[in-house]
């Protein structure tokens, strides 16, 4: 008896989508996914359009032919198919991570172009076990949040749902299914290249591990992650816990912070450091412990710079403060019709007809701008403006959007951006992200 497509896919609500993107490389996992998904969608009264997308990473000479063969197989079975290529220059280091980032970027673009609400991938139980073992080796201990491994559901770029329905299905079960159907697959030789981390783990420690024991450890790590998240969600329900100014400086109630468990404190302050610094990931375990010790008064310094964030401990009832440090702030061009993210902290939308450069103002430049406009603001507000974006036109400072009473150029709109949530948001953290956003908001206003 084969696998049940209904049992696998029904919990994900794919039937509500206009279209579904299946990521298909031609390997056994993705082909197993494709044909099980096709069978499931055929049971629906009004099924979404199924589109198979193959990403050619251009890393091997054979990859173009393999992508073409996936297309021929899809054509034979009446499945829409397209190939997307990663044509960018390849990095000398971190190739696997760069390829993964490019792959998801291309898949998200394909989903948006097709109006697809879901991207579905063929990650299996074997991949889940390998992910746990890889992260455990990196973390050095068993308390890391990443040991919850992959979430069955995630949100990509704030709008496209990612589903991993096969995390409880073994690779062998998928191969048995394909064999039963008479469908051949291709083994990517890079999956056996021990220069890469995952193949090294797959052929080494994963081959010797007790799979059931690892899955139990994943469940335990997931439960611990949920407990820490729930503690923060509960704390954030109180409006007094967390505040923010227009430039993104956050104020954390010291008493609320002290009332949390050490693990929840490390998560909370690490999360705020990531948001303040515009980073996509939490600081490492050691960095999070260092922040927590400083804010709890266990370590002497009252200020700490971590992950691009400047963190200051509040004294005598004052809140702890988190803001961007004034280093490595970017300069970006904003042309008509463009939507860009600046410094991982702000989204700019330009629906007007003018082009600008976005950059932080220099101190003297800001002082002169304030003087020429007849404004005088206190030092604290000036410091906040120095880590905020300003708009330049023709090389001249044209607008300081967060200055009290400032007028934004026509057609320019700014929103707050949370890099840690807005690119890849694991399902583990949906409730936490909603609670944080409810406190911090997206709207930007003047610094007052």
Curated annotation (Swiss-Prot):
ATP binds at residues 25-30. One of its GO terms (biological process) is tRNA modification. Keywords: ATP-binding, Cytoplasm, Ligase, Nucleotide-binding, tRNA processing. It comes from the Bacteria. Transmembrane segments: none annotated. InterPro entries: Rossmann-like_a/b/a_fold, TilS/TtcA_N, tRNA_Ile_lys_synt, tRNA_Ile_lys_synt_N. Its EC number is 6.3.4.19. It catalyses: cytidine(34) in tRNA(Ile2) + L-lysine + ATP = lysidine(34) in tRNA(Ile2) + AMP + diphosphate + H(+). It is found in: Cytoplasm. It is an enzyme of class 6 (ligase). CDD domains: TilS_N (cd01992). GO terms for molecular function: ATP binding; tRNA(Ile)-lysidine synthase activity. Ligates lysine onto the cytidine present at position 34 of the AUA codon-specific tRNA(Ile) that contains the anticodon CAU, in an ATP-dependent manner. Cytidine is converted to lysidine, thus changing the amino acid specificity of the tRNA from methionine to isoleucine. The N-terminal region contains the highly conserved SGGXDS motif, predicted to be a P-loop motif involved in ATP binding. HAMAP family: tRNA_Ile_lys_synt (MF_01161). This is tRNA(Ile)-lysidine synthase.
């Amino acid at each position: 008896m084969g696998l049940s497509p209904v049992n696998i896919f029904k919990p994900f609500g794919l039937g509500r989508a206009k279209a579904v993107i299946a990521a298909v490389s031609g390997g056994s996992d993705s082909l197993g996914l494709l044909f099980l998904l096709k069978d499931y969608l055929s049971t629906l009264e009004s099924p979404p359009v199924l589109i198979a997308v193959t990403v050619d990473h251009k890393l091997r000479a054979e990859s173009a032919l393999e992508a073409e063969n996936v297309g021929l197989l899809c054509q034979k079975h009446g499945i829409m198919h397209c190939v997307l290529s990663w044509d960018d220059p390849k990095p000398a280091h971190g190739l696997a991570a760069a390829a993964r980032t490019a792959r998801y970027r291309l898949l998200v673009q394909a989903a948006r172009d097709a109006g697809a609400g879901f991207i579905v991938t063929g990650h299996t139980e074997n991949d889940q076990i390998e992910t746990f073992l890889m992260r455990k080796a990196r973390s050095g201990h068993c308390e890391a949040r990443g040991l919850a491994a992959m979430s069955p559901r995630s949100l990509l770029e704030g709008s496209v749902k990612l589903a991993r329905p096969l995390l409880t299905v073994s690779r062998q079960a998928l191969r048995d299914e394909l064999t039963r159907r008479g469908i051949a697959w291709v083994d990517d030789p890079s999956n056996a290249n021990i220069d890469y981390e995952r193949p090294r783990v797959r052929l080494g420690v994963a081959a010797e591990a007790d799979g059931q024991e690892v899955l139990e450890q994943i469940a335990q790590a997931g439960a611990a992650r949920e407990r820490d998240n729930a503690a923060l969600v509960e704390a954030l329900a109180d409006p007094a816990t967390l505040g923010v100014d227009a430039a993104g400086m956050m104020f954390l109630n010291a008493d609320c912070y002290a009332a949390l468990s050490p693990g929840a404190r490390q998560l909370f302050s690490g999360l705020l450091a990531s948001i303040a610094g515009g980073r996509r990931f939490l600081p490492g375990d050691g960095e999070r412990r260092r922040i927590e010790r400083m804010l709890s008064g266990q370590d002497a310094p009252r200020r700490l710079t971590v992950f691009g964030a400047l963190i200051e401990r509040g004294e005598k009832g004052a809140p702890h403060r988190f803001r961007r440090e004034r280093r490595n702030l970017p300069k970006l061009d904003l042309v008509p019709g463009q939507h860009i993210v600046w410094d991982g902290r702000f989204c700019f939308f330009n629906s007007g007809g003018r082009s600008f450069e976005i950059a932080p103002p220099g101190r003297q430049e800001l002082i002169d701008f304030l003087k020429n406009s007849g404004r005088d603001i206190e030092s604290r507000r000036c410091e906040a403006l120095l880590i905020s974006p300003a708009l330049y036109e023709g090389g001249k400072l044209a607008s300081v959007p967060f200055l009290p009473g400032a007028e934004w150029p026509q057609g320019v709109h700014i929103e707050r951006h949370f890099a840690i949530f807005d690119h890849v948001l694991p399902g583990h953290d949906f409730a936490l992200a909603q609670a944080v956003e409810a406190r911090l908001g997206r709207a930007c206003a003047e610094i007052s």
